[in-house]
Design a protein with these regions (language model features):
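Beta-turn initiation residues at beta-strand->coil junctions
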Residues: 75-78, 101-104, 124-127, 148-152, ...
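Short aromatic loop motif centered on NTY/YTY
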Residues: 136-173, 180-185
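Bacterial Sec-dependent N-terminal signal peptides
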Residues: 1-4, 11-46
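Helix-adjacent hinge/juxtasegments
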Residues: 106-137
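Edge beta-strand at a domain terminus
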Residues: 45, 176-201
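Short, hydrophobic/aromatic-rich segments at coil-to-beta transitions
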Residues: 67-72, 93-100, 118-123, 141-147, ...
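N-terminal mature ectodomain segment of secretory-pathway/periplasmic proteins
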Residues: 82-109
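N-terminal helix-cap/turn-to-beta initiation motif at the start of protein domains
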Residues: 55-70
Length: 201
């Protein structure tokens, strides 16, 4: 009986020893995997940043960068209706594009500005359900004007779409901006708008 007790004690020690090792491994393994995953991710990010090209942008693009930030204001339409507007501009895609999130009367849209063959252009993802493209038509020290670019396939006299846009911004008054735009209807009549915005600090 004494011998059996000793054997049983050894067996228990061996058993619990194994269980303890298993518990330790269960705790250590996830930690090691987490460390490995983080090391891999950071390594990839580091190498990715090292491989990214230096983006060259147009003068118009650099001018547009001046309005990066959040803005709020009112839009007055040609029919007299006044709408609340919020918008935010961000530099994205390694400095190669500028996104604009626009909320008009609670409806959200997005416009992406970027250089195409050295000329600033834009794609406007509209609540009308289409995506008109615009291209820079004129630039001054305080304004950028865009006209419709038919490359998107929309056609005047057939479709209703946003077809003109102007951003007026004077760096000497960095917290004020005026934007105008037009939407052309299927019958070629035009709805115009003027938006006065203040920078949100």
């Amino acid at each position: 009986m004494q011998k059996d007790k000793k054997v049983s004690k050894k067996s228990l020690e061996l058993l619990f020893g194994k269980e303890t090792n298993q518990i330790k491994m269960k705790i250590i393994t996830p930690i090691l995997l987490t460390i490995f995953a983080h090391t891999t991710i950071f390594g990839q990010e580091g190498s990715l940043k090292a491989e990214l090209p230096v983006i060259k942008t147009s003068k118009a693009f650099k001018q547009l960068q001046q309005i990066v930030g959040k803005w709020k204001g009112k839009m007055k339409q040609s029919d007299g209706k006044i709408i609340d507007v919020e918008t935010e501009y961000k530099v994205i895609a390694n400095g190669s594009a500028i996104s604009q999130i626009l909320i008009e009367d609670g409806l959200e849209m997005i416009t992406i500005f970027n250089d195409r063959n050295g000329t600033l252009g834009a794609i406007h993802y509209c609540v009308l359900g289409n995506q008109p493209t615009l291209v820079l038509s004129n630039r001054t020290k305080t304004s950028l004007s865009f006209d419709f670019d038919p490359i998107c396939g929309l056609k005047a006299g057939k479709d209703k779409f946003f077809n003109k846009h102007e951003i007026s911004y004077n760096p000497k008054k960095p917290n004020e901006m005026i934007q105008t735009g037009t939407v052309i209807n299927e019958d070629r009549t035009v709805n115009a708008s003027r938006t006065e915005l203040k920078r949100v600090k």
